[in-house]
């Protein structure tokens, strides 16, 4: 029972101390309030009577002066805050509300596509698309075309893209060619509504198009992809045409060289009346050798008859005639080797004929090589034909961006106002603590 009594007594003393402390604080606040009212009235009287003042030696007067100074600082801080709200916070709030009211809500349509060839289709990946074969440049070329002024002009000419955003139902800050020079640059406005992002890791390009409605955003995105596909097909066809045309011209040139070499060969054959002068000369030498053999045999037989005293033999006249005929034929064949037939003789034109035949063979080999290269070039051109492949069709979603480019300056003023507000609060708190 003694312990419980001690606890009870301790609680009563604690409650009594708390009550006395509370009463003391209330009394102190009441005294300070009464003192402030007294000092305010005294301060008002001091404006009419400048000689009135407090005694510096009085401790209560010093305390009252300190409270008055602190009260004045509090009033100045409150006045600064009111001015801050009136001249900065309130205008910024009005501007922000106007920005929300004067900007339109847009829908954003996203589509994913790639640019590839038949050769890279089988083993397509992000690395093969952008890493090998300089495929990255092809993707960036399509991106630059979509974001070019040429595409902007075509979209405006065929679809009225910029005119669509200049309608009165679009808010002032989001409208194209709005009053006061807002959104007056057509190309910059076009880039604010059309963008293309390149994902190097995935090897894809993502198209983003904004419009007032989801259906219109998807329509514009689909048309941009169609124009980009036409551009890729046109560039690819032009590259193939130029390559094949060059190869065909090379084949044509080789064929013309072959025809010229064969024509020169036919001319020399026509002049010499020989298909192959070398074979003709060989045949002449064989004829001369055969005639000389027969002539030697006839002369030997004739001499044998004469040695035996058979000069009256009936074979003698026939052998004599044979010898004369053989000698005449040998002479004619030798004249064929030495005399000129037309502009060249057979022996003299042999080197010229060999040169022409060699040139003809070289021209034929070059023509066959050019023809084979043309066939390979056509196959390679088919494999390297570029085309635009759409991975995902345009799908529209609500765009969370509500501000046009003309309202970006608002963020700067908001940050500036917040900085000024925080600085003013810190200064006020410091003055109040002093």
Curated annotation (Swiss-Prot):
UniProt topology in membrane: Multi-pass membrane protein
Domain of life: Bacteria
Compartments where located: Cell inner membrane
Membrane-spanning parts: 84-104, 409-429
GO cellular component: Gram-negative-bacterium-type cell wall; plasma membrane
Keyword flag RNA-binding: no
Region (Disordered): 1-58
Keywords attached to this entry: Capsule biogenesis/degradation, Cell inner membrane, Cell membrane, Membrane, Polysaccharide transport, Sugar transport, Transmembrane, Transmembrane helix, Transport
GO molecular function ontology, one term from the record: carbohydrate:proton symporter activity
Biased composition (Basic and acidic residues): 1-50
Any one biological process term the GO annotation gives: polysaccharide transport
InterPro entries for the chain: Bact_polysacc_biosynth/exp, BexC_CtrB_KpsE_VexD
Keyword Kinase included in the entry's annotation: no
Family, similarity comment: Belongs to the BexC/CtrB/KpsE family.
Record's function text: May form an ATP-driven capsule polysaccharide export apparatus, in association with the VexA, VexB and VexC proteins.
PANTHER family: FERRIC ENTEROBACTIN TRANSPORT PROTEIN FEPE, TYROSINE-PROTEIN KINASE
Name listed for the protein in its UniProt record: Vi polysaccharide export inner-membrane protein VexD
